Amino acid sequence: MANKPSAEELKKNLSEMQFYVTQNHGTEPPFTGRLLHNKRDGVYHCLICDAPLFHSQTKYDSGCGWPSFYEPLSEESIRYIKDLSHGMQRIEIRCGNCDAHLGHVFPDGPQPTGERYCVNSASLRFTDGENGEEING
């Protein structure tokens, strides 16, 4: 795992929601994330360490209220953790580089993978493929 900033540094540089999601395994309210409706071409990075996670070509509207992707950029991009919280069986996804919480993956996505990576906007930074503009979720 990469060296990540201290909790104090993160609290100073992140919004309350960004800290809650990435560091406390929280979930932003559905349909509120800044990147939910983003349709521009580019790459979604980890907000904490800037590791590339998802390409916009794999993003789709699942109707669940969070940005959804059917595949990460690489297997190394994502770390998978069994999550038995809240009386459910789920697979948590974390940044493969810094271990920040991203969301969960479910087996109900579209082809070609059949997977839905349900990701909190608050854990992402989008970089526009045309002009390099960055947008924090």
UniProtKB/Swiss-Prot annotation:
The keyword Transmembrane helix does not apply. GO terms for cellular component: cytoplasm. Residues 7-129 form the MsrB domain. It comes from the Bacteria. One of its GO terms (biological process) is protein repair. The active site is at residue 118. The gene is msrB. Belongs to the MsrB Met sulfoxide reductase family. One of its GO terms (molecular function) is zinc ion binding. Its cofactor is Zn(2+). Zn(2+) binds at residues 46, 49, 95, 98. Binds 1 zinc ion per subunit. The zinc ion is important for the structural integrity of the protein. The keyword Cell cycle does not apply. It is an enzyme of class 1 (oxidoreductase). Its EC number is 1.8.4.12. It catalyses: L-methionyl-[protein] + [thioredoxin]-disulfide + H2O = L-methionyl-(R)-S-oxide-[protein] + [thioredoxin]-dithiol. The lineage of its organism: Bacteria, Pseudomonadati, Pseudomonadota, Gammaproteobacteria, Enterobacterales. PANTHER family: METHIONINE SULFOXIDE REDUCTASE (PTHR10173), METHIONINE-R-SULFOXIDE REDUCTASE B1 (PTHR10173:SF52). Keywords: Metal-binding, Oxidoreductase, Zinc. This is Peptide methionine sulfoxide reductase MsrB. It comes from Escherichia coli O45:K1 (strain S88 / ExPEC).
